[in-house]
Amino acid sequence: MSQHVMFNAVLSSHPALFIQGEWRIGNGVSFEKQDPMSQQRLWQARAADHTDVTLACHAARAAFPAWARASLEQRATVIQQFAALLEQHKQSLARTISLETSKPYWETLTEVQAMIGKVAISLQAYQTRTGHSQTPMGDSMSVLRHRPHGVLAVFGPYNFPGHLPNGHIVPALLAGNTVVFKPSELTPWTAEETVKLWQQAGIPDGVLNLVQGGRETGEALAAQPDIDGLLFTGSAHTGYHLHRQLAGQPEKMLALEMGGNNALIVEQVKDRDAVVNLAIQSPFISAGQRCTCSRRLLVKTGAEGDAFLLRFTAVAQALRIGRWDEQPAPFMGAVISSQAAERMLAAQQHLLLLGGESLLNMTRPDSQSALLTPGIIDITNISEVPDEEYFGPLVSVIRYTDFTEALKIANQTRFGLAVGLVSEDRQQFEQLLLEARAGIVNWNKPLTGASSAAPFGGVGASGNHRPSAFYAADYCAWPMASLECEHLTLPATLSPGISFDLPKV
């Protein structure tokens, strides 16, 4: 707790921007981060204004040639040193993430471990997806190489403030790009501590730059002529805004990883508690603040489905919630802010007014805290269900009669991130694979389960395909194809119409 108290003493003028290898005080407005549980101030500094953002982009541009020309081994050495420092500082960084996000400590430890694992996976992805290959073609060689874009802007989210931006920063740097990192204004402290580790790892000046702030800072960064691409993780609302802002600029690479209105289909309930455990993990892990969380729980009508829902509701009601460091450890903490808590309660009320039936009422035990209890609402009888991602611990139940109807309901969304099936019928899963409009399709596993060794992303309003996890490498380098021949000789057979049977000049 001493770390928490010490940080409260930091003045608003503390240097929270990292530009050209130096920590600087921003020229923008002062903003702060509060503990979601206690509303106590954790962090305060000044945001980056347009001048700061321009300076960061210029620094990244100036640093690009040398970093891009460095060997892969040289770049990998710095990145591997960063991973080693993450290992050394795993507990302190996990505590920082817990304080900012309210996620339990056991969960944030796994987040930092995922950051460490991302380095080895990114090296593998670089070689597999964007490496160097040669194909003989007679007297020549077809060679495929990949080149970095240049300056990439990375926009990070608040739900995984360490792991998700790390999943773009690491492959971007490995490919030879330089980066301007703009984290969520709701998790500035995690970003600052992470960049300090990059500095200790020996990242060259200007290769990685940090600009802090909210919407104004983000818009200034997206509008910079000096960026060659933008990698974004966050809400569909913000992603759409960035897409419009960069419209008409096809020369800039835009990678959007957004949210989902994901469906989990409970078709069979053989082991009731095993199914309930999976169904609890899917909507309520991280207080429902994962893009892959199930927002819709599709349950087959009948006695088996009724019994499952009763057990599911009882287990959800008994979930331990609380502060990140409480013992025994809680399953989930608060949502990210009081404003987020208010939005979730408003969403629940809206669904009830539309005709939904509350199976478990989501509540806010303390009006001064962003802590919410899990909520379950049956929306089967709502004629026009809002196609929204409610980013918190609220799941909507929809009853269905047969599997064909379940598939139809699952696809009734503009999003296309994740869908899951609980069933022991392999043929049903094969049918789901054929008909699902989603980038992630899980079978008898929580929707929130995903592998960094696989592509991650969705279609529709969930983003432009796979800008995260293993395929992030694709967005960090562009392919360069070459036909190469060391010695030029006249072909034995000439093209029709060409003759060299001419008088010598």
From Swiss-Prot:
Residue numbers annotated as active site? E257, C291
SUPFAM superfamilies according to UniProt = ALDH-like
Question: Recorded E.C. number(s)?
Answer: 1.2.1.71
- Key words of the record: Arginine metabolism, NAD, Oxidoreductase
Pathway(s) where this gene product acts: Amino-acid degradation; L-arginine degradation via AST pathway; L-glutamate and succinate from L-arginine: step 4/5
UniProt keyword annotation of NAD present = yes
List the catalysed reactions. Answer: N-succinyl-L-glutamate 5-semialdehyde + NAD(+) + H2O = N-succinyl-L-glutamate + NADH + 2 H(+)
GO biological process terms held by the UniProt record: arginine catabolic process to glutamate; arginine catabolic process to succinate
Which annotated residues bind NAD(+)?
A: G234, S235, A236, H237, T238, G239
| Keyword Kinase annotated | no
Residue spans making up a coiled coil are: none
Q: Which GO molecular function annotations are given, in alphabetical order?
A: succinylglutamate-semialdehyde dehydrogenase activity
Q: Which Pfam families match?
A: Aldedh (PF00171)
| General function of this protein | Catalyzes the NAD-dependent reduction of succinylglutamate semialdehyde into succinylglutamate.
The record's section on NCBIfam families has: arg_catab_astD, PRK09457.1
The family annotation for this protein states:
Belongs to the aldehyde dehydrogenase family. AstD subfamily.
Q: What is the designated name of this protein?
A: N-succinylglutamate 5-semialdehyde dehydrogenase
